[in-house]
Regions:
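Active-site neighborhood of HAD-like aspartate-dependent phosphohydrolases
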Residues: 1-45, 49
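Short, acidic loop-to-helix structural element flanking the phosphoryl-transfer center
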Residues: 28-55, 66, 86-89, 260-269, ...
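Substrate-recognition "cap/lid" segment bordering the active-site pocket of phosphatases
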Residues: 62-109, 115
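PRPP/pyrophosphate-binding module of the type I phosphoribosyltransferase fold
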Residues: 105, 119, 123-135, 309-387
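Acidic, Mg2+-coordinating phosphoryl-transfer loop and its flanking beta/alpha structural elements
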Residues: 110-157
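Active-site-facing substrate-recognition patch
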Residues: 174-265, 306-334
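Short cysteine-rich clusters marking metal-coordination/redox-active sites
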Residues: 388-391, 410
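Short metal-binding segments enriched for Cys and/or His
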Residues: 413-427
Length: 427
């Protein structure tokens, strides 16, 4: 097994701006003053006890990194230019051991606290772990690097989320069953893990949240994110067995979810973002919703106005999506939702505009707990830097809707790009 691991924010609590002069190599660091996260040293030793190769990957200055590396007992070290992988690729190219390990990417991990770490891991097509050991005040959140930006880091699409080094070791012990619920089910395993995209607690038994069961990747990623399975939802020829598996994943999760809720919460409504009359295939979500097995009473609480024009999918940003929802999506006026506890099902989470709007509408109508659960979260695109041989534009990885096969696309203007339309098959 091979583990690449970040330093600042992952092994040491040194993301605060006060550490910048040391990280930049402007001052010598006293290793006795470096705040090492609880369990970090023990984790490193346990990795070595298991025969795991560990490589420290940091973009801080060698003057700062080297003494901390020695203090932590780390054997491997590489100084990177995150999220650029060129120098890391060169480092791997002269190490037969690392090359051999990477022939089995399912046994390789990149562990870090920010989206830059996750992006590197995705470019390497290995498993990634977002390790969340600290919080920062809003004034210290760095949306560029991802320090403290929890939602931005989740949008990069880590394979796993962990909150301690014990969590990380448990992932190592049973990696396929620690995947997100839908991703684990695809490979024949069972998991109750979900992407906890957003949560807000009002009290012990009053909460709103946005959860996702799997990732829908764009571009490079590990092999467990499956955009092809998301696209199958909209396939007019989708098989009933596919719908059964999709609904089965959610049924299993709902059973687990209910068992973990406070006894005072009784879920009163299970609903879904209903299909528009123009939706293809017809009743796309209803056919899945009807297959869900749950003791929670089902109800159709959301409807689209028939006068709606266009598609939510074609609204390119958060604000335009929200305005489309304001104009055309309605909550059933005939249902008293005061004190209700509602779970809403949808096929995809993109910007979060739909989820937040629906949650607010139900809360405004008096609902207490509202959980929005999407089958797939669309994660950030990670490119492959392939250049079109015909026009010189960067190409993007896409999947064909009809068969799920990947290809490089020089995206033309009619699809939002500036390319010539050239296509190179991958699969």
């Amino acid at each position: 097994m091979l583990v690449f691991i970040d330093l600042d924010g992952t092994l040491t609590n040194t993301t605060h701006p006060g550490w910048r002069p040391y990280r930049d190599g402007q001052e010598d660091v006293d290793v006795n003053m470096v705040p090492v996260f609880q369990g970090a040293k023990e984790f490193i030793q346990e990795c070595y006890n298991r025969g795991i190769h560990v490589v420290l990957v940091s973009d801080s200055h060698p003057r700062y990194v080297e003494p901390i590396r020695a203090m932590l007992g780390l054997q491997g070290i590489f100084l990177a230019d995150k999220p650029n992988t060129q120098r890391l690729d060169e480092y791997i190219a002269v190490s037969p051991i690392l090359q051999q390990e990477l022939t089995h990417p399912e046994n390789c991990y990149f562990i870090g606290d920010t989206k830059l770490d996750i992006e590197i891991g995705r470019k390497m097509r290995i498993r990634t772990i977002l390790l969340q050991l600290y919080s920062v005040p809003d004034s210290d959140v760095d949306v560029h690097s991802g320090v403290g930006d929890r939602m931005g880091n989740l949008k990069m699409g880590p394979t796993y989320c962990a909150f301690s080094f014990t969590d990380v070791l448990q992932i190592f012990d049973d990696p396929d069953r620690k995947l997100y619920a839908r991703e684990s089910r695809i490979i024949g395993q069972e998991s109750t893990n979900v992407i906890r995209f957003w949560e807000h607690s009002y009290s012990y038994d009053t909460k709103t949240a946005i959860l996702c069961l799997a990732r829908q990747e764009e571009g490079l990623c590990d092999s467990f994110a499956r955009s092809d399975k998301y696209r199958e939802i909209s396939n007019p020829n989708r098989a009933p067995e596919f719908l059964d598996l999709l609904a089965g994943t959610l049924s299993s999760y709902l059973h687990f979810f209910e068992s973990t809720c406070p006894p005072s919460i009784r879920w009163t409504h299970l609903t879904y973002l209903s299909d528009k009359s123009s939706t293809k295939p017809p009743e796309k979500m209803k056919q899945i919703f009807d297959r869900i097995q749950s003791g929670i009473p089902k109800a159709k609480l959301l409807t689209w106005l028939e006068r709606n024009q266009g598609s939510l999918r074609n609204q390119v940003d958060y604000q335009s999506r929200r305005q489309f929802l304001v104009d055309f999506l309605r909550v059933d006026d005939g249902v008293d939702l005061r004190g209700a506890n509602i779970i809403v099902i949808d096929d995809q989470l993109t910007t979060g505009a739909t989820a937040h709007y629906v949650i607010k509408q139900f809360r405004d109508r008096g609902a207490k707990n509202v959980f929005f659960i999407a089958f797939f979260q669309m994660i950030m695109e990670v490119g492959d830097a392939v250049i079109c041989p015909q026009c010189g534009q960067k190409m993007k990885i896409r999947r064909r809707a009809r068969d799920g096969k990947r290809f490089y696309s020089c995206v033309p203007p009619q699809f939002g790009g500036q390319g010539c339309g050239n296509i190179i098959n991958i699969d």
